[in-house]
Structure formats: structure tokens, C-alpha cells
């Protein structure tokens, strides 16, 4: 009669590969917004201290709120997170405009140039980098003010920055 193998017999065969599959560990995607980061960390937005990528200063609570309102994206470097403060955001917008300006289109002509409705065109403020809403884009069209093509993206001026010019 054959005896069943004991645990000692199977130990001679070496380590088992069962359960040791070599699959890459998938990490969850890193949040793109400060609100998303606060939710992931389960902390209030007020407790988020995020340094500016350019000057290193921590964003104020108002700048944290503006960052998400402008629909800007967090910068991740080796699992460290950075954002952009108001001053550096404005400086970056100015630099980008001066270095990468391509063309100017007045008012409703943007629809002819792009082949899209003004409501379907993504436009950021060339001063503060906020995404323009429909009313702001219509205001530019109605007043025959300029839209600028900068680095392949459309720029205009938001209602707040318009008052500082």
C-alpha cells in the first residue's frame, strides 16, 4: 500500500510558487486637485499645506481654493506634491504668453478659426490662468476683444483680471 506524501516529503521540493505571482503592484492614481488630495488623506481642506513648485512658499487657504477653482493640476515629484501660488501663477502665465504667443483672433472670429462654438472652446485667462466661463467668453466676443493662441491653447481675459488692466 502506498502511503500519502507527508509534509516533510513536499518540503524537499523547494519553495512553492503558489501565491507568488509576479504582478506589478498598481498604485492608485495620485489626485490632480487639492480637494481630491484632502479627500484621499481624509483631512479638511484647511489642513492642506502645499508648497509652490516655483517659489517654495506654502499656498494660503485662499490660494488653495483658487488653485482648484482655476482647474489647475497638482505637480507630483517622487510622491511629493506641489502646486502654484497666485504670484507664480501670474508670472508663469506672463512668461508663457511672451515666449509662446502664436496668433490673435478678435471676438466671434474664434468660431470660424476653430470650427467650434465658443461654448466648446477651452479658454484660460492669459493673466491668472483661470478657465473662462461662458459669460466671460461671450463678453470677449461681444466687445470684439482678442483671443490669443498661446502654445496651442486659447487665452482670453477673465472678468476679474479685466478690471485690473
UniProtKB/Swiss-Prot annotation:
GO molecular function: DNA binding; zinc ion binding
Coarse class of the protein's main subcellular location: host cell
Keywords: Activator, DNA-binding, Early protein, Host cytoplasm, Host nucleus, Host-virus interaction, Inhibition of host innate immune response by virus, Metal-binding, Modulation of host cell apoptosis by virus, Transcription, Transcription regulation, Viral immunoevasion, Zinc, Zinc-finger
One GO cellular component term noted in the UniProt record for this chain: host cell cytoplasm
Location of the protein in the cell: Host cytoplasm; Host nucleus
Superkingdom field: Viruses
Zinc fingers classed as unnamed: ranges: 52-88, 125-161
InterPro entries named in the record: E6 (IPR001334), E6_sf (IPR038575)
Gene3D superfamilies (UniProt xref): E6 early regulatory protein
Family: Belongs to the papillomaviridae E6 protein family.
Protein function: Plays a major role in the induction and maintenance of cellular transformation. E6 associates with host UBE3A/E6-AP ubiquitin-protein ligase and modulates its activity. Protects host keratinocytes from apoptosis by mediating the degradation of host BAK1. May also inhibit host immune response.
Subunit structure: Forms homodimers. Interacts with ubiquitin-protein ligase UBE3A/E6-AP; this interaction stimulates UBE3A ubiquitin activity. Interacts with host BAK1.
UniProt xrefs under HAMAP family: HPV_E6
Listed name of the protein: Protein E6
Species assigned in the record: Human papillomavirus 20
Amino acid at each position: 500500500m502506498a502511503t500519502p506524501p507527508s509534509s516533510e516529503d513536499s518540503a524537499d521540493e523547494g519553495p512553492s510558487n503558489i501565491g507568488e505571482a509576479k504582478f506589478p503592484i498598481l498604485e492608485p492614481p495620485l489626485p490632480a486637485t487639492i480637494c481630491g488630495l484632502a479627500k484621499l488623506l481624509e483631512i479638511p481642506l484647511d489642513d492642506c499645506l502645499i508648497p509652490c513648485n516655483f517659489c517654495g512658499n506654502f499656498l494660503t487657504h485662499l490660494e488653495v481654493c483658487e488653485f482648484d477653482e482655476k482647474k489647475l493640476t497638482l505637480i507630483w515629484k517622487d510622491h511629493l506634491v506641489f502646486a502654484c501660488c497666485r504670484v507664480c501663477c501670474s508670472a508663469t502665465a506672463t512668461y508663457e504668453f511672451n515666449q509662446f504667443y502664436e496668433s490673435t483672433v478678435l471676438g466671434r472670429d474664434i468660431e470660424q478659426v476653430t470650427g467650434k462654438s465658443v461654448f466648446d472652446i477651452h479658454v484660460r485667462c492669459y493673466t491668472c490662468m483661470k478657465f473662462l466661463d461662458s459669460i466671460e467668453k461671450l463678453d470677449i466676443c461681444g466687445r470684439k476683444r482678442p483671443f490669443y493662441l498661446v502654445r496651442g491653447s486659447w487665452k482670453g481675459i477673465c472678468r476679474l483680471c479685466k478690471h485690473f488692466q
